[in-house]
Amino acid sequence: MTRSANSPFEVAIVGGGITGLALAVGLLKRNVSFTIYERAENFGELGVGITFTPNAQRAMEALDPCVLQSFTNVASAPSGGTINFVDGVREQGSEDPRTSTAALLFQLHVKGGYKACRRCDFVDQIVQHIPKDCVQYRKWLDSIETDHESGRAVLKFRDGEIAHADVVIGCDGIRSQVRASMFGTDELCPRAQYSHQLGYRGMVPLAQATAVLGPEKTSSAVLHTGPGAFVLTIPLAEVHAMHIEAFIMDKEEWPEVQTSSDSKRYVLPATRNEATKAFAEFGPTVRSAVSMFPEKLEKWAVFDMLEAPVPTFAKGRVCLAGDAAHASTPNQGGGAGFGIEDALVLAEVLAVLAEAPNVSGIVASEALAVYSEVRYERSQWLVRSSRRTGELCTWKDRDWGLAAEELSRDIISRSHQLWDHDTAGMVSDALAILGERVRGADTAF
């Protein structure tokens, strides 16, 4: 079946997280019609920190310079463009973190910039570029079917409403309903699973952090490694705050949380005392950093798709992007950025489809298959590598505090594989493959 030449090519974006919003701006730039279907009442994001590495920033600019500008408006870069990896257990000097010294294992130099911001600030910036009439809120997807007359996708929502689209892009996160519609929901189907890593996250005033830890330890990003856990502190000068992430490797299973809110399934109440006990064997800097958490806080389960990946990101007129496609642990700071890379390839591929007078189901399927082909292996690498980086930072194999050179080589190599990706080449490859595939797939294209 083929779309009528008089009907505009329409993209349905399910999910209004960062990947979905970035894709929307990229489509807008390329004059591709779209609608975002967001289950929440607004685009509100948590006020926790998020990082974007150089590859992600290049993809932002290629999507639309306003995406990169939205980020840089609210982002901070670590002093000197480095992340200091230190031994978080053994410190020299006193028990006062302002005067104690942690052994520097190595410095990770981020060429081109490693920047962080609060999620909510970035979202507030980027939504300003999306027309309000392109968004529908409180739309909880129930199923995706095919209109047998037109061949287009039919989205059915829990409120009884339906929508039609030429292609559907699932940007609906780790518990993706789009993914479920593609592959099913039983235990053998692709899905995100508990990685046995949990985290405590918080933002504290930078002045408070400086008073507790000292100016030297709050002027740059520091990753404190240690047995079974690690802590990352990132100063965000533009918002006068320090973002603290404390991660623990957990042997238990994550309990099933019954809630209508998808994000709350991965959150449990916790206390500062619980967090401080987990880091009791660490040095004074880590213990003091964790002590700045509020008395009542939350602990977050880290889910990824290492054990149950999707076999492909595309199936017919439907595909996945971001966490819905390749949820990963946050240990390399690359997950959100890979969603931006996904959005760039999709925006370019969909722009080609939108320019065609007619788009059949065959051509739409081929185009989305090209996106999957270009993005799949790199994304699966990140899932594996990010999990391994967490093992390195928590000394799973050995006391890396005593083998800094070997640790340095491993993490630096992984980091450059993440950062140095040829973004322009990725897009060129996708368009070249698309041209070859569709040339013989449909003469109406």
Swiss-Prot record:
Q: Which residues form the active site?
A: R201
So which cofactors does this thing need? FAD
Q: Which residues bind FAD?
A: E38, R119, D323, A336
EC class of this enzyme?
oxidoreductase
The GO biological-process annotations, alphabetized, read as:
secondary metabolite biosynthetic process
Its pathway is:
Secondary metabolite biosynthesis
Q: What is its EC number?
A: 1.-.-.-
Q: What is this protein called?
A: FAD-dependent monooxygenase sorC
Q: What is the lineage of its organism?
A: Eukaryota, Fungi, Dikarya, Ascomycota, Pezizomycotina
